[in-house]
Amino acid sequence: MHSRENNRKFKISKEIQRKIALILQQKINDPRIGISTVSGVDLSSDFSHAKIFVTFLNKNTKQQIKSGLFILNKASFFIRKILNKTMRLRIIPKLTFIYDYSLIKGRNIDDLFNNNIVKISKKSI
């Protein structure tokens, strides 16, 4: 039974992710958000809450990220209304937008890795 529930939760999460990405591209025109990417959705087991993980292109400072998240969280009711029209769910989850730092962390790890390769290459010469 758990497998079927998890499969349903996974499918709904992916569909919410896809729909919100489209909504952000087509319906939310705020320069403080700019170009955003929905990198994941964490849906609660009862489908009443969803954490939406986003990243912003060319928004790197904490203030820019904070401002973008503020705008998205303020627009969450509007986004839920659109989801309600486009998805056939009994409950449209309450949306909370969270910045996804994994891309930045991945870049930092990649930089460390590349720096170590350069150091090793210089030592072997």
Swiss-Prot record:
One of its GO terms (biological process) is maturation of SSU-rRNA. The keyword rRNA processing does not apply. It is found in: Cytoplasm. One of its GO terms (cellular component) is cytosol. The keyword Nucleotide-binding does not apply. GO terms for molecular function: ribosomal small subunit binding. InterPro entries: KH_dom-like_a/b, RbfA, RbfA_dom_sf, Ribosome-bd_factorA_CS. Keywords: Cytoplasm, Ribosome biogenesis. Its main location: cytoplasm. One of several proteins that assist in the late maturation steps of the functional core of the 30S ribosomal subunit. Associates with free 30S ribosomal subunits (but not with 30S subunits that are part of 70S ribosomes or polysomes). Required for efficient processing of 16S rRNA. May interact with the 5'-terminal helix region of 16S rRNA. PANTHER family: RIBOSOME-BINDING FACTOR A, CHLOROPLASTIC-RELATED (PTHR33515:SF1). Belongs to the RbfA family. Monomer. Binds 30S ribosomal subunits, but not 50S ribosomal subunits or 70S ribosomes. This is Ribosome-binding factor A. The gene is rbfA.
